[in-house]
């Protein structure tokens, strides 16, 4: 992972496969463990004890930018910006098929799955409100391979697995996602490592 250090924040380009903080079955090799080791006490202590500097999170299987607060003032200001939605969170996802309509807004509730507590699911009435705005950037079609779409997703809320759940619920599962996929979706002659 790459890192940019400033007086009051760190900006980390997190790789896929790394958890933000320790949790069940994964107590080492997390962003928090690395921050504690390399930043020592130069992190904010606002919030939960075992999440120093952590203002927001992204899923373990997601790569992307994480902003980490080095002091309490920056932590509080960043938290307020996330709460007031003045920081844009934009992600790119490669999905199976053509997403219909090509752009739109997904608004519903997301809750823990009753079948598997490690997964989330869409609900019409229960859970936390979740809003994802999306637009198709490009469609990849060929007579000899499946159709894929590159989709830009802009979050208004930040729920666990939000993009994965929303796109999966539309029938456009993220390529390489092992948790929210249909069993018949296989990539022929392509190494799934390319999609991590």
Residue ranges and their predicted role:
Residues 1-2, 6-196:
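RNA pseudouridine synthases
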